[in-house]
C-alpha cells in the first residue's frame, strides 16, 4: 500500500548560486555525512546538490511533514545500490515519521538535465 507520494523539481542554477555564495558550508547544511563525502569526491557540482535537494524535498512531501516536525534535510539521505539505483535512508525525525507510517520501502526516481533536476518518491507500507 502507498503511504506517501512526493515530487520536486529544482533549477540547477539556484543551487549553483548558493554554492558560489556560501561554498561548502551550503553543502554541509543539506547533505548527510556520506553524501558530503560523495559530493567532495565527485567534483562538488551544483548538479549533484540539485539532485539531492530535489530528492529530499520530494521525500519530505511523501512523509507528509515537509521540513517541519523536526525533519531536516540531513535526516534524508540518498543512497545507491550496486547497480546505481537510488533509494532513500531515513535518520532522526524522518526515520521516526517513516516508522509511524509503517514504511517498508522508499522508492526514488531521479532525473536531471543541464537546467533542472527532478525527483519522485513513493513510500510503501507492508
From Swiss-Prot:
Catalytic activity as recorded in UniProt: apo-[ACP] + CoA = holo-[ACP] + adenosine 3',5'-bisphosphate + H(+)
Cross-referenced Pfam families: ACPS
Entry's EC annotation: 2.7.8.7
Lineage: Bacteria, Pseudomonadati, Pseudomonadota, Gammaproteobacteria, Chromatiales
Keywords: Cytoplasm, Fatty acid biosynthesis, Fatty acid metabolism, Lipid biosynthesis, Lipid metabolism, Magnesium, Metal-binding, Transferase
InterPro entries noted in UniProt: 4-PPantetheinyl_Trfase_dom, 4-PPantetheinyl_Trfase_dom_sf, ACPS, Ppantetheine-prot_Trfase_dom
HAMAP family: AcpS (MF_00101)
UniProt binding sites for Mg(2+): 8, 57
Alphabetized Gene3D superfamilies for the sequence: 4'-phosphopantetheinyl transferase domain
Family: Belongs to the P-Pant transferase superfamily. AcpS family.
Protein name: Holo-[acyl-carrier-protein] synthase
Amino acid at each position: 500500500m502507498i503511504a506517501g507520494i512526493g515530487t520536486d523539481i529544482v533549477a540547477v542554477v539556484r543551487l549553483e548560486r548558493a554554492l558560489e555564495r556560501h561554498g561548502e558550508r551550503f553543502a554541509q547544511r543539506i547533505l548527510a555525512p556520506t553524501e558530503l563525502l560523495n559530493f567532495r569526491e565527485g567534483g562538488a557540482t551544483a548538479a549533484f546538490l540539485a539532485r539531492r535537494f530535489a530528492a529530499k524535498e520530494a521525500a519530505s512531501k511523501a512523509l507528509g511533514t515537509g521540513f517541519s516536525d523536526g525533519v531536516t534535510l540531513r535526516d534524508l539521505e540518498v543512497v545507491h545500490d550496486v547497480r546505481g539505483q537510488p533509494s532513500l535512508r531515513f535518520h532522526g525525525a524522518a526515520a521516526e515519521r517513516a516508522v509511524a507510517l509503517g514504511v517498508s520501502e522508499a522508492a526514488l526516481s531521479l532525473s536531471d538535465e543541464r537546467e533542472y533536476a527532478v525527483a519522485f518518491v513513493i513510500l510503501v507500507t507492508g
